[in-house]
């Protein structure tokens, strides 16, 4: 079973990678990009029947730094 976990910096946390991408887009002539937030997508292939609580535990313990990042689980 595939589970996607999207991890993003929380609102208010400085995103230097996103800012660098925004700046580079402007330098390439892509005007109008006012902000970029960069995160990561983690695709898990877990055993059928793995419950959401198990995936939540994975996120809490390893996949996301919950002090500065939020995550979204999609099955």
Could you describe each region identified by the protein language model?
Residues 1-75:
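Non-catalytic terminal accessory/regulatory regions of metabolic enzymes
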């Amino acid at each position: 079973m595939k589970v996607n976990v999207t991890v993003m910096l929380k609102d208010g946390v400085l995103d230097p990678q996103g800012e660098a991408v925004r700046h580079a887009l402007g330098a390439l002539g892509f005007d109008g990009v006012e902000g970029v937030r960069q995160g990561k997508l983690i695709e898990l292939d877990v055993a059928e029947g793995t419950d959401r609580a198990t995936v939540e535990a994975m996120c809490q313990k390893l996949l996301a730094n919950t002090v500065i990042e939020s995550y979204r689980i999609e099955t």
